[in-house]
Amino acid sequence: MHAPTMKGKVYLMGAGPGDPDLLTVKAVRVLRAAEVVLHDDLVSPKILDLIPASTQVRNVRKLGLQAGNLQEKIHSVLISAAREGHQVVRLKVNDPLPSEGADGETEVLAQAGVDFEVIPGAASAMGAAAGATSR
């Protein structure tokens, strides 16, 4: 694993519709520099392949908790890793900020005093339009 940096930060990142070519340049840069990645179960394996082998990668569904406690555990892992000085990515399917503000992650991180940044993902409709070709 990478040596922790002086100040940890959490990046709430959208994986878009699953095509790595549709990630922003910033998203790819941050993903490759991450020390800890917590990802949704449905994030494309092609996107997960961009993560360096030295990075601690965890599928949030494998944290071993029931659905009711899962979000609290995710919050706990994000906060702990950032407080330890790590660069942390919370990688979500599509866009990280649906109607509930990343499942309350922005609010929880702010209340905990953890530095965070949102890196949007391409919406599925935009990805479909970008992939449209003529024959």
Predicted regions and their residues:
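Class I S-adenosyl-L-methionine
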Residues: 1-20, 25-122, 126-127
